[in-house]
Structures are given as C-alpha cells and as structure tokens.
Amino acid sequence: MQKIFLGRSIAERIDPDYERHGTTGIIASRNVATGEIVHPLIQPTRKEEDYLAHIDGVVSLHATHRHVFINDNLNNVFMKTLNTHKSESLVRFIAGIEGIDQSTLGVKDKSGILKNMKSRAEFLSDKSHQIVFVYTPKHCSWLNQIECWFSIITRRLLNKRSSFISLEELVMKISDFIHYYNQFLKKPFKWNYKGNLLRV
C-alpha cells in the first residue's frame, strides 16, 4: 500500500489499491534462555527440505546440547497445511543423530516409524533423544514462544501500514529487524500467569 501524505494538519491516508510484489516465508527458532532468534530462514518456500535445513542449522550451532523444538498440532501458523514438522526426512535426520539404523525405520505410509504422521510424531517426541519435538494441543500456539515472536514482528514490521517496494526490500527489512532484535531487544519472555481460574 502506498502512504499518501497530504500536508500539515491533514490526516495520513492509505490508498486501498496496492501492487503486490510477492511473498516470502520465515522459518525460525527462539532460544528461550536468551530470547535470541536462531538460524532464521527467510525464503519463498516452506517445504520439508527447508524445515530440515533450519533444524540442521540450529542443531549444528550447538551440536552437543539437547534441543527441544515446540510445534503446534497444526504445524505452524505459516505451515498449517504442510507436514514438514513430522516428515520422513526429519525422522531420518533425527535417527542419524541418535545412531539409529535407518533400515529399522520402516517404509513411509506402509510400516514402522515412518508408517504415518502419528507414528513419526511419537518418534520425534521421544524424550530420550537429544533432539525432541513437542507438539502442543490445538489452540495452544500461545505456548509456542516463536509464535509469540511472530506476533512481535507482525506488530512492529509487517503490519497493515507497512509498505515495501519489492520482495528484496521485504526480505532485507525482515533480516534487518531480526538482527536488530537479537542485538538490542532479545530477552527471555517472563510468563506471569499464576494458574488461577478466570472469573466472569
């Protein structure tokens, strides 16, 4: 959308007609201890291999640490219709890290751990693994801290008053915001709900 500045003492107006220059996606993780956005991928696709590249990038930063990735049951706000968080390639990646023989995983859509999304999710949620995926219940995306951060970037950068002249500018602004956030704004979220029942 193009902002129209009319001069002194006249309210800003936004032209309802706009030209769309393209879209992009963000795949990111948040370090809950520091608040840092870790290994963000800003690209037009959100495929299985993209999500796996993100997970691999996060894990390779601290290969000896235990990693917990939280995903909502719909996968992610940006990935609701995709199965990227329970994919065959992700199961094989985790099995490789855990030293599990690939031949014991079964065949996708037929047998073993790879039989269906439920069996893959159970494997990825195994708490004995060095990398664990937690799938929150439906309507609990507020528990997923990266979803809270997506709300921050939406309010501060990607709101309805935002205007970008090209896809390249959008990607640059998102990247700049992440860099600025990590440098000056990062901090752990402080949860303050006490667990008391709400009263009407």
Kindly give the residue locations of the regions a language model identified:
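Short functional hotspots at interaction and active-site rims
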Residues: 1-200
